[in-house]
Amino acid sequence: MQELTPMMQQYMEIKQKVKDCILFFRLGDFYEMFFEDAIVASKELEIALTSRDCGNNEKAPMCGVPYHSATSYIAKLIEKGYKVAICEQVEDPKLAKGIVKREITRIITPGTFIDDNISTANNFICCISKDRSEFALTFVDVSTGEMYSCLLEEDLQKLVNEIGKYSPSEILISNIEDELYEFLKKNCTSFVQMIEFVDLQKCHEIIENQINVGKIDEKLILSVGNLLKYLTETQKISFDYIRRFEFYRVQNYLQIDINTKRNLELTESIIQRSRKNSLLGILDQTKTSMGSRLLKKWIERPLIDIIEINKRLDSVEELKSNYSTLVQVEELLSRMYDIERLSSKFAYKNVNAKDLLSLKKSIEVLPTLKQFLSSFDSELLKEIYEGLDTLEDIYALIDSSINEDAPVSLKEGGIIKEGFNEEVDRLRNISKNSKELLVEYEEKERNLTGIKNLRIGYNKVFGYYIEVTKSNYSLVPDRYIRKQTLANAERYITEELKKLEDEILGADQKLIELEYQLFCEIRDRIEAQIERIQKTASNIANLDVLCSFARIAIDNEYVRPNVYLGDRIYIKNGRHPVVEKMIGRGNFIPNDTELDQAENRVLIITGPNMAGKSTYMRQVALIVIMAQMGCFVPADEAHIGVVDKIFSRIGASDDISSGQSTFMVEMSEVANILKNATPKSLIIFDEVGRGTSTYDGLSIAWAVLEYVADKSKIGAKTLFATHYHELTELEERIPGVKNYRVDVKEEGKNIIFLRKIVRGGCDSSYGIHVARLAGIPEEVLKRAEEILKQLEEADINRKNIRKLRREIKKEFTEQIDFFSYKKEEIIDKIEKLDILNITPIQALNILSELKHEIIKAKERQLI
């Protein structure tokens, strides 16, 4: 260490404090990295690796990035899983005695990275604490000042579901929770970090010192306190700007697990992994980033309180009914900047003049916006009107102080508007008019001395001077101080000229320093009002989402749903909001739906693949979600009895990372549904059992369907799509189970999918027809038809089917004791069977019984 240069010694001392980070070490206009950090960063960032003399007879590996463009490089490192420590020069190099003082000013982690240019979405960091039988979760977005907390029972699947709603970039847990750490690493995409938790008392102190959000549930203290401790240690700032703390209970919202969120493509499409072609992508007609972020929260947390739901629906209806006002409000909203994110910029002292001008432009529309809102009668719009602060004092301050063309940099000058500060105006005048000032002084001295050829000059040794020729020496006044003698002239200075020189030469620097000082004062005055700005941003976000709902209702001909506390879901000509947008409204076939606890509890849906079963079931779930969000829905009519949870089991995929097969994944999801569904839930099952053999799959599907249909077990409203046509028998066995099919039209060897859901079961899967549509060669299709015919005639699997029917049969219409029958009587019984009037299943059951009794009779030598 002693052999290193002083600067490199300073680097090593600082690096020891952040061993787990890549250290960005400020040197002039660059952030430099050395040694192992440089090797890693040069590779990850694809920048040149050089070297620097470090004083120990060898060169240190080195790379660097310009400080003004460092954010994009930091983003790349964060994305690759690294943490970055920022080390800044904390004193003016010109004033430094020896090595410039440097300190770590911030540690950037996945959950604390902020860059408006990369994404306008939330970036949450999460902290999880565990107490007895509960998890406490706290989520913070440092860029917006939002904080949310909830309590969950100790259920790992529910933990993953709740984490999935926020998609945090970083999760913090106690360093003693090894099992939880391994689980989260395996089941979450977030950066998971173990930290040393402080105790309850220390957490109370941290919370009291950092935020002012009122009383917090004691069970949340460890989670909130340790998260704030981590943020304070890494960000080196106070988090008193966090004023929006929301504690919520999961059961107070429509619960949607992470699999259902993915299957229904609520916020991103499965294939593209983007918001395009997702429900969010369709519904997002917001005009502000604030509104877009709030809409995503509403989609992931629909309501179950019908009063709150109808407050939203009332507002949407009123906006929709006042189209001209809606258009004007939308135009005003489109002029709003992301003022919600200003709170963190003030806290980090990252606000620049452009940010204040953006705030000013946003505030500028508020009085007009509030005037439009004054005409509305719906409760929620009235609440927004009353809560909308027009911030006119902040507008006046910015308007009077900040230049419209102010630069982004705070160290270039040109920030403060003329007339705001007398000293700024004076210095700016000196800086701009230095030549004129010197000419004025020169003319003044000529008049005072009578020296007509007196001139003002400048050199680097003496600065500004007065030059007088030999012929005028006698006119030189005593106040002139001689500085230099030339062959034919003398050079002088005066106290006044020296003062003018100081002003001229120092005006630019003094002006920059004064403007920066004034800007900081303005910034601090506005920061003191940040809570008002946050409340306004929140009201703007709510208004923006409601306007978005009104806009899509108008553009897509959505209707207001009747949301109530009953158990019936009735949808007339419902449509899938995403699919109809993709293929065009005129090409989408709408369908009716009726679900209730009594007559239509479970709908078994059969029909060929590609016929539209999955689309239909998804659209029912999406319409329910939209209704409980307070959004109009794609239908001619909709009556939605509030549901508490929505589950879906759709698709098949291996979980390679955990070594789980398609079938194991499927069964795990089914188990989760059976464990957590209630009579008020809505369940979607798509092809349960297809991940295993035909008979295992059929038996599982049958048993699952019986279980969810049974009111004493679950009795939830269920849509059950299947290719097991045998399940259609359950309509006759279980009250509330109804058969539906997707209608098709056969034309020779071709079929036409009519996409219409109609009553009754389907007795053919049309597999070969679908294969023909997929482009399978005709030769292969002909061979498939031959094999199918042979299999149907031979019925080679009858034995297994008979066995299955015996196992699951609850009741057989006629019990016959064949033990007393003679061989002739058995033959006679068979001859009398009315083959044309019994179902295949009944025939198989009878054959199974006959065979069984014949074997027993032989054993007893009855035959």
Curated annotation (Swiss-Prot):
Belongs to the DNA mismatch repair MutS family. It comes from Caldicellulosiruptor bescii (strain ATCC BAA-1888 / DSM 6725 / KCTC 15123 / Z-1320) (Anaerocellum thermophilum). SUPFAM superfamilies: DNA repair protein MutS, domain I, DNA repair protein MutS, domain II, DNA repair protein MutS, domain III, P-loop containing nucleoside triphosphate hydrolases. Signal peptide: none annotated. The keyword DNA-binding applies. GO terms for cellular component: cytosol. GO terms for molecular function: ATP binding; ATP-dependent DNA damage sensor activity; damaged DNA binding; mismatched DNA binding. It comes from the Bacteria. Keywords: ATP-binding, DNA damage, DNA repair, DNA-binding, Nucleotide-binding. The lineage of its organism: Bacteria, Bacillati, Bacillota, Bacillota incertae sedis, Caldicellulosiruptorales. This is DNA mismatch repair protein MutS.
